[in-house]
């Protein structure tokens, strides 16, 4: 019987990168046919790239070919975003004719994101995120990402957990919440003391990393109050499951945007603690 893995290996052999072909060639480690066969989960988290920005032109996803796009107040499909004076549909950021892969940064904080969302009306993305937000890449611009998506599984129309910046979404990723769960359960609205609407807590302050030092320094100070609910690594520690974060506090653009730095269990971790060894030192 031809498995999905066999089919994909043959279908992508000519086009896929060598690293992807090598991965597909490795026999699946199927012993029980259950989740117990999974030994390692590797997650790479990027920022500031929307689903359609990468995969809007990929066949088989609800990208620019979506048959049922969100309607705007004007009655037009959601692609026709306004900058306040004109409509700007999606356009190709062609890396063959420009420095499109670098391009320009766009706003990505809570205020501009909420304004673009506009209570679900979604009509002013180009106004509050700038027209650059409407640019997208194609297969020739990001061939490796397209090869991965076609060789393995892609989650259709995958979006951020919270319509705001990087730190809040990384806090959700590492803990399942951006707002103290106990308060949420009581129906109490969040404040900036117990939630993260904008980038704040996931940076050392001042940015006092020490170049060349192999360990986080005891002099690190952090911005904002500590969060004290459990992170995913805390739960894995309790369950006896191994984990590691490959982000070096002393060699990663000032240690910025490490999602666990918002939490007391990481901010106050001491040398030898699991969260210190596996969460703050970078190496294996």
Language-model region placement:
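N-terminal pro-sequences and low-complexity stem/linker regions of secreted or lumenal proteins
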Residues: 2, 6-284
